[in-house]
C-alpha cells in the first residue's frame, strides 16, 4: 500500500478495510475502482453507492498534493461505465497559483483521460467552489450532473450553478468528454507519440489550440495529459496538469519524471510552452522538449 493511504485506511470500517486491502496492496494502485470492484465493495459492506462513495472519500483526499494550503480536498467521479475515479487537489510550490488543480478537476480529468465517456455523479468532501462549478458545466453531462456532499441531499450541478453560462451559449456542440480526434499524425518515439495522441484528444473549441503533454518516469511508465478548455476561459485545465495529475494519482512523485514532451501547433493562438517549461522546472524536471503538430 502506498504510504499516503495508510492513515485514511486505518479510519475505515473494518469490513471496508478487509475488502479494500487487496485492491490497495499495489504501491501504484491507479486511484480508480472498476465497476466490478465497486460491486464487490457494496456487497462486502452493505452500503449503497452514495454511502460507499462517502466512505471512500478519505482515500481520495489522501491523493491530494496540497503542498501550499495543507487543505486536502478529495473527489470521486462516477462514470457511466461504472468505474469510479479518485481525484485530489494539487498545488505546485515554485510555480503560480494559476497552475493549481482542484479536486473536482482532478477526478474529472482522471476519468476523461482514462477513456470515460460521461459522468453520472461526483462526490466531494467540501462544497465545490465557483471555479469547479464552471469547470463541470463544460461536461457533456451538463447541468444534470449529480453532486453529492457529506450531510446533504444530492443536488444537480444546475442547483449549484443557477443561470449558468456555458458552451451552449457560445454555440459549442462538442463538449468535454465527448469523443474527439484532431487527426495529427503520430510520429517520433513513444513519448512523442503519446504527447501527440493526447493533443488529438484535446477539448479546445474556443482557441483551436490543441495540445498534449507526455511525461516519462524513470521506470519507463508514461503519463499523458490533454488540454481541456472552458467557456469561461479561466477554469481551463492545461495539458501538463492532466499529465501530472495521472502521474501523482498512480503513486509516482515529481522526482520520478526523467523526460517531458509538449505537443502543440507552432502558430496556435495560445501557446503552452513557457508555462509548461516553467512549472516542470519548478518541480525539478529540466529535460523538456516540444514537438510541433502538423
From Swiss-Prot:
GO biological process: one example: cytidine deamination
UniProt GO MF annotations: cytidine deaminase activity; identical protein binding; zinc ion binding
SUPFAM superfamilies hit by this protein: Cytidine deaminase-like
Keywords attached to this entry: Hydrolase, Metal-binding, Zinc
PROSITE patterns in the cross-refs: CYT_DCMP_DEAMINASES_1 (PS00903), CYT_DCMP_DEAMINASES_2 (PS51747)
Co-factor(s): Zn(2+)
InterPro entries: APOBEC/CMP_deaminase_Zn-bd, CMP_dCMP_dom, Cyd/dCyd_deaminase_Zn-bd, Cyt/Deoxycyt_deaminase, Cyt_deam_dimer, Cytidine_deaminase-like, Cytidine_deaminase_bacteria
CMP/dCMP-type deaminase domain residues: 48-168, 186-294
CDD domains associated with the record: cytidine_deaminase (cd01283)
Annotated binding of substrate, by residue: 89-91
Cofactor note: Binds 1 zinc ion.
Domain of life: Bacteria
Reaction catalyzed: cytidine + H2O + H(+) = uridine + NH4(+); 2'-deoxycytidine + H2O + H(+) = 2'-deoxyuridine + NH4(+)
GO cellular component, one term: cytosol
EC number(s) per entry: 3.5.4.5
Active site residues of this protein: 104
Pfam short name (any one): dCMP_cyt_deam_1
Positions contributing to Zn(2+) binding: 102, 129, 132
Family: Belongs to the cytidine and deoxycytidylate deaminase family.
Subunit structure, as described in the record: Homodimer.
Described purpose of this protein according to its UniProt entry: This enzyme scavenges exogenous and endogenous cytidine and 2'-deoxycytidine for UMP synthesis.
HAMAP family: Cyt_deam
Protein's recorded name: Cytidine deaminase
Amino acid at each position: 500500500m502506498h504510504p499516503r493511504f495508510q492513515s485514511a485506511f486505518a479510519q475505515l470500517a473494518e469490513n471496508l478495510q478487509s475488502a479494500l486491502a487487496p485492491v490497495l496492496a499495489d504501491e501504484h494502485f491507479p486511484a480508480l475502482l472498476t465497476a466490478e470492484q465497486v460491486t464487490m465493495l457494496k456487497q462486502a459492506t452493505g452500503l449503497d453507492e452514495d454511502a460507499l462513495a462517502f466512505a471512500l472519500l478519505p482515500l481520495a483526499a489522501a491523493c491530494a498534493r496540497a503542498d501550499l494550503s495543507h487543505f486536502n480536498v478529495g473527489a470521486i467521479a462516477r462514470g457511466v461505465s461504472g468505474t469510479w475515479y479518485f481525484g485530489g487537489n494539487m498545488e505546485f510550490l515554485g510555480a503560480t497559483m494559476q497552475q493549481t488543480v482542484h479536486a473536482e478537476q482532478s477526478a474529472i480529468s482522471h476519468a476523461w483521460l482514462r477513456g470515460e465517456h460521461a459522468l453520472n455523479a461526483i462526490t466531494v468532501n467540501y462544497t465545490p467552489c465557483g471555479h469547479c462549478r464552471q469547470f463541470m458545466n463544460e461536461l457533456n453531462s451538463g447541468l444534470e450532473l449529480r453532486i453529492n456532499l457529506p450531510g446533504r441531499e444530492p443536488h444537480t450541478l444546475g442547483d449549484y450553478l443557477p443561470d449558468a453560462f456555458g458552451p451552449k451559449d457560445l454555440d459549442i456542440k462538442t463538449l468535454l468528454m465527448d469523443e474527439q480526434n484532431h487527426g495529427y499524425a503520430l510520429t517520433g518515439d513513444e513519448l512523442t507519440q503519446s504527447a501527440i495522441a493526447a493533443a488529438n484528444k484535446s477539448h479546445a473549441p474556443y482557441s483551436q489550440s490543441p495540445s498534449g503533454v507526455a511525461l516519462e518516469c524513470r521506470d519507463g511508465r508514461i503519463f499523458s495529459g490533454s488540454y481541456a478548455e472552458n467557456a469561461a476561459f479561466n477554469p481551463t485545465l492545461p495539458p501538463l496538469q492532466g499529465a501530472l495529475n495521472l502521474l501523482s494519482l498512480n503513486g509516482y512523485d515529481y522526482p520520478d519524471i526523467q523526460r517531458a514532451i509538449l505537443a502543440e501547433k507552432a502558430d496556435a493562438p495560445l501557446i503552452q510552452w513557457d508555462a509548461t517549461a516553467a512549472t516542470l522546472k519548478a518541480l525539478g524536471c529540466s529535460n523538456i522538449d516540444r514537438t510541433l503538430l502538423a
